[in-house]
Regions:
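Acidic, serine/threonine-rich low-complexity disordered tracts
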Residues: 30-145, 184-289
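Hydrophobic, well-structured mid-protein blocks that either form specific transmembrane helices
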Residues: 139-179, 183
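N-terminal acidic, proline/glycine-rich, low-complexity intrinsically disordered segments
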Residues: 2, 29-30
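Bacterial N-terminal signal peptides
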Residues: 12-22
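Sec/Tat signal peptide C-region and signal peptidase I cleavage site
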Residues: 24-28
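Bacterial N-terminal signal peptides that target proteins for export
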Residues: 2-14
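Compositionally biased regions
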Residues: 4-5, 20-21, 53
């Protein structure tokens, strides 16, 4: 029995957009890996740590809708781990999976784990284990900020492992720590229409993820109204997206900056991400406690 290429592309696209929407892992501008002469201590001052708005014990849950179909679910939790040589550390765990009838059509089980320095928010270790249909990938990164390097171990399916070491700017993030670094940004100090950026290391490449502040907007979820900051990642067009502004993320316009809702138009429809549960918030708001 032959599979339908069109359907397979659709399902692979949904798996990709679920991952991309949640992680904000979308390439804005790919750049070559930097050499030591180009590294500066804080190339992106907006992301210099200014006091964390999250804490161990926080957990967030999201659902993903493709049209009227409940396609997937993701859970994020923050826990305290044993202190390392760097001092107190936190682990951010992200687990995503397709749900309901959709998982029988295209099964997705993804795990992302980032261990970060509690003081700076910078990543120390990153683990990614994804299973999407017949595609499997495992990645492990070890960050060494005394040398501004990341040691990468990548294994795809049954292929041999690829091990390499890369130079990075000091404030680089993995795809999970980047999501939480965004929450610590003082968005009230960034003007509507302005663009900020964060250096991101993903898939053995370093690039700058650009984000446009699109202003303040109120949205309604489950009969409640929430005031949100609208953030637009500048995404790469082509395989999934038609336009570079086809992904919009809404974060709460309070001190927590929780990603509340995201919407993206792709080549074959629209996908929505909604926060369904929040607890253990460091700064309680109208959604969580």
């Amino acid at each position: 029995m032959h599979s339908n290429p069109k359907r397979l592309n659709l399902l692979q696209g949904i798996a990709l957009i679920i991952s991309s929407t949640l992680m904000l892992g979308v390439r804005a501008q790919e750049l070559p890996l930097v050499d030591a002469d180009t590294i500066s201590p804080h190339p992106f001052p907006a992301f210099t740590p200014n006091g964390s708005v999250y804490q161990p014990g926080e957990s967030l849950s999201y659902t993903f809708q493709f049209g009227l179909i409940h396609a997937a679910q993701a859970d994020i939790s923050v826990t305290e781990v044993s202190p390392s040589q760097h001092g107190p550390s936190w682990e951010i765990l992200v687990e995503g999976r397709t749900t309901g009838a959709f998982k029988w059509i295209f099964k997705v089980e993804d795990v992302y784990r980032s261990t970060i320095d509690a003081a700076s928010g910078l990543p120390l270790h990153f683990h990614r284990d994804i299973h999407e249909g017949g595609y499997e990938l495992r990645q492990d990164y070890a960050f060494d900020w005394t040398r501004n390097t990341v040691h990468s171990h990548r294994k795809k399916g049954d292929q041999d492992s690829v091990i390499a070491t890369y130079l990075l700017p000091q404030t680089s993030h993995d795809m999970v720590s980047a999501l939480y670094a965004l929450r610590n940004v003082k968005w009230d100090q960034i003007q509507q229409g302005d663009t900020t950026g964060i250096p991101l290391f993903m898939d053995e490449e370093w690039f700058e993820l650009k984000l446009v502040h699109q202003g303040i907007k109120s949205i309604k979820m489950d009969g409640k109204k929430y005031e949100c900051i609208v953030i637009q990642p500048v995404i790469q067009t082509g395989r999934i997206w038609k336009k570079s502004n086809d992904l919009v993320v809404y974060v709460t316009n309070d001190s927590s900056h929780i990603p509340l809702y995201a919407e993206t138009r792709i080549l074959f429809g629209k996908i929505r991400m909604e926060l369904t549960h929040a607890e253990g918030l460091r700064i309680p708001n109208s959604f969580g406690h």
